Amino acid sequence: METDGRSGGTGCSVKITIQMEAYMLVTAKEMLEKARDGKYAVGHFNINNLEWTKAILQTAEELRSPVILGVSEGAGKYMTGFKTVVGMVNGMLEEMKITVPVALHLDHGTYEGCLKCIDAGFSSIMFDGSHYPIEENVAKTKELVKITREHGMSLEAEVGSIGGEEDGVIGMGECADPKECKMIADLGIDFLAAGIGNIHGKYPANWKGLSFETLDAIQQLTGDMPLVLHGGTGIPTDMIKKAIDLGVSKINVNTECQLSFAEATRKYIEEGKD
């Protein structure tokens, strides 16, 4: 944007150029609603350091794809705090000239962690109240709906514990109660994570697969609410496609990135490139 400024009494015209901020975080709400309507899913990839963040942003820009950068509370602590993460990501968006939509999202947040991320400048948060009785999950989620709306952020909530381990929290991979999903969805959240037999980490050989019966029942009761599939690593492609057909608009991936990073690092060192 350009504007003319007049130097008082001299008759000289000074042209001032103001650079508008072109590279900035957005909420996940709009990108997931577009994904829902377009019958595709947006990838959520957890970041644990600068290298992961750079690789994910580069790939998203090359593919012209929106992306959600997920941060667990453990990763946030490792990177010295959520404000450090926000500063790093905002700086990289600008320096790398990232033009695709990018959301910075707290993954499996506690109530206290959600408040810290709101204060730090995240554009989206997930409150994981799945380990609480449904009444307490509802109460805390309701409070966060109000706060996130005031700050123009998007909010994900969870019903039914996702299996495996996430930041030291172990879930058994239960299937959520569709009626409880509706209770949480009706509070005004933007997207919903529900346990449908999915787990974090590697899937065991005896894994029974996703419960599409549960997913279909949840979708029927929550309407056009974008749904989230956690534990995306290792789920067969045909199951992924069917989940998207039934309303999944966001798929979380972390384990696959960890395995790839570890393998590449090990290979680099073994080849003596250090």
Where are these regions (language model features)?
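Ser/Thr/Pro/Gly-rich low-complexity, intrinsically disordered segments
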Residues: E2-R6
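N-terminal amphipathic alpha-helix/helix-capping segment at the start of soluble metabolic enzymes
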Residues: E21-G43, N90
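Alpha/beta enzyme core
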Residues: A28-L32, L50-G74, T84-T99, G109-G223, ...
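Glycine-rich beta-to-alpha transition loops that act as phosphate-gripper elements at the mouths
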Residues: I47, L104-T110, P226-T237
